[in-house]
């Protein structure tokens, strides 16, 4: 068992060098990973895979919401007629409304700490889906725009492992 005090924190490049991976900076693709880390169990593995892929320069991770289902449940009446789960399950989904992005953010902090990676920014995404109006903002969307506008000859890829809300907001901010 490993105590927190025993953990080594290091830069991502240091980890890749220890693993024997060395790809020139100019050959690495720029990637922002958007993930609803707390929604499904596979997202943590996918994010770590990106972080340890030597061909990628991970610019940042955006913690995304997973709100669509709880909103759908909220709109259904009566619950049992159209959904295969019981009322208690629907109540759990309703209780998460507006909180899922923060759940993903906390999971992202935990994941980076467990991996010992301290140089990849973790940003908060939108707390919910877009409801058709302008003016939505998220730290993650602002980061996407900032990275996209950088003077860098390499293209920027945004890998969405969950909701595309922050990418849509970024596009609305800077088409």
Segments from the language model and where they lie:
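N-terminal acidic, glycine/proline-rich low-complexity segments
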Residues: 2-175
């Amino acid at each position: 068992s490993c105590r927190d005090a025993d953990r080594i924190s290091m830069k991502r490049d240091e980890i890749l060098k220890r693993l024997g991976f060395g790809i020139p900076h100019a050959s690495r693709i720029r990637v922002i990973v958007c993930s609803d880390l707390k929604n499904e169990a596979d997202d943590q593995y996918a994010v770590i895979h990106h972080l340890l892929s030597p061909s990628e320069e991970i610019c940042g991770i955006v913690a995304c919401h997973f709100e669509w289902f709880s909103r759908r449940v909220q709109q259904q009446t009566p619950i049992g007629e159209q959904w295969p789960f019981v009322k208690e399950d629907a109540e759990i989904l309703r209780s998460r409304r507006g909180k899922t992005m923060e759940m993903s953010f906390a999971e992202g902090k935990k994941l980076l700490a467990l991996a010992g990676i301290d140089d990849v920014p973790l940003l908060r995404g939108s707390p919910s889906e877009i409801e058709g109006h302008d003016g939505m903002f998220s730290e993650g969307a602002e980061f996407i725009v900032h990275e996209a506008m950088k003077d860098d000859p390499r293209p920027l890829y945004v890998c969405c492992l969950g909701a595309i809300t922050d990418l849509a907001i970024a596009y609305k901010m800077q088409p």
